[in-house]
Amino acid sequence: TPSFLRRIKDEEKKEMVEEYQRYLAEKGKRVQSFVKPKSEQGVPVLFGSDPEVNLVEYDSEGETKIVAGMIYNAPNSHRSWNETFRDVKRMRDEEKKKVVDAYLSGRTQRWQKVGRAFENAYARFEILVNIGAWRDIHRHRMLSQQRQNFSCFHGYDVPPEITESGIEGQFRSAIGRVEDIFSKIVKHDPDLAQYAVTLAHRLRFMQWENLRQSFWQIELRTIPEGHPDYRHLCQKKFLLLEKVYPLIAPYMRTN
């Protein structure tokens, strides 16, 4: 709740604030009855060591829209979007590439952001990764993210350092105790049960993003200094984008 609402002294207005808080807090519970039972949701992942990344939605005309966006606000452009888009649709791939080359000419560093033309195409990713990696990835704001509850339903990752240290058995034993506690709490309160989940457990979430944000996130999160978990995640995102946006993806400065 915004801090200025928490400072309200008027009792009637306080009640309005509380109603607003309940509205926000309980929206998930209001749709619980529409969710299929666990047995119908598919077989959970048991153990994992690599992020699972799927591209579930993209724009088949996305690259055409991006190129049209580049031309649309050129200093001498005064034609409508529909006219510009129609012209670009008639272009051959080589012609489109020349436009992109010109638009990005001089970009030599990842911190040199690509322009708003790249916001004309979107992609939706569904990701399964340990909560520790998600905590880094979810901080990106120029995209929409929806996560499911923290849980023990999707398995967990065993960091290689744990195995190398010879304590994998102890690690798995501790995880087992955590999962026993989780299974008892989740029957009564799925929200409260989230506090019993470790950062090693896997979380399923979605990212709905425009290609400008894809450039920023993938270029930043694949640098060699980054954590292997989110590096692998973003490398997989890049490989998926490369298949559906073959004109645009190669311009990403991916490691």
Segments from the language model and where they lie:
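A conserved ligand/cofactor-binding region detector
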Residues: T1-N255
